[in-house]
A protein has these predicted regions:
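Short, structured "edge-of-domain" segments at secondary-structure transitions
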Residues: 1-191
Length: 191
């Protein structure tokens, strides 16, 4: 799997840096701005690294949002790809993982040691919080997967001076697989 580092700019553009192009850990490093061409006045706001099949919840402080896969945000251009439409005075909110795209793989534990694998199911709900202290949750199926980006749907109605503080995808349950007492396989569903 080839992972990509996505850089979300304050102008709504998404910049792609192949992880293999990042400097090694033993050097002095280099600023991310040497690997991408940011427009004048644009700041990198958020970063996300993952495989192409990962689905993210993208939102802006204006209260709009949508779902998108990393594969749709990729660009070979150093200037990035216009993907999230943000209005004047709005900011891009931190992306939230909806689905990893495939089940996590685990390696067997050495003999005599217990191993636990946590399976992350795709998110089932979205929680939105406004700067005015309001919270709204709804099922994630109400959102669109937008391959070309854009503004999206209204996530939460905002008061005139409020903004969207953030939106996060979550699941109401987690399934844990592991080795229990006596070396027997065990599975737990946490609601």
């Amino acid at each position: 799997t080839v992972d990509h580092l996505l850089v979300f700019g304050s102008n709504g553009r998404v910049y792609t840096v192949p992880v293999a192009n990042l400097p090694g850990a033993r050097g002095d490093g280099q600023p991310i701005t040497t690997l991408i061409d940011l427009d004048a006045g644009t700041q990198p706001l958020h970063y996300f690294a993952g495989a192409e099949a990962v689905t993210l919840l993208l939102s802006g402080s204006g209260g709009y949002g949508f779902l998108a896969r990393i594969e749709h945000m990729l660009s070979r251009q150093r200037g990035g790809k216009a993907f999230i439409t943000v209005g004047a005075g709005e900011q891009v909110c931190r992306p939230s993982v909806v689905a990893l795209g495939s089940e996590p793989k685990s390696t067997p534990a050495p003999s005599g040691q217990a191993q636990a694998v946590i399976s992350f199911a795709a998110a089932t709900h979205v929680a939105c919080a406004s700067t005015g202290g309001r919270i709204l949750t709804f099922e994630i199926g109400e959102l669109k997967l937008m391959e070309k980006g854009g503004r999206g749907l209204t996530l939460i109605d905002l008061e005139p001076k409020d903004t969207l503080a953030g939106a996060a995808a979550y699941t109401r349950s987690v399934r844990i697989f592991g080795i229990g007492r006596g070396g027997k396989a065990r599975e737990e569903q946490l609601e």
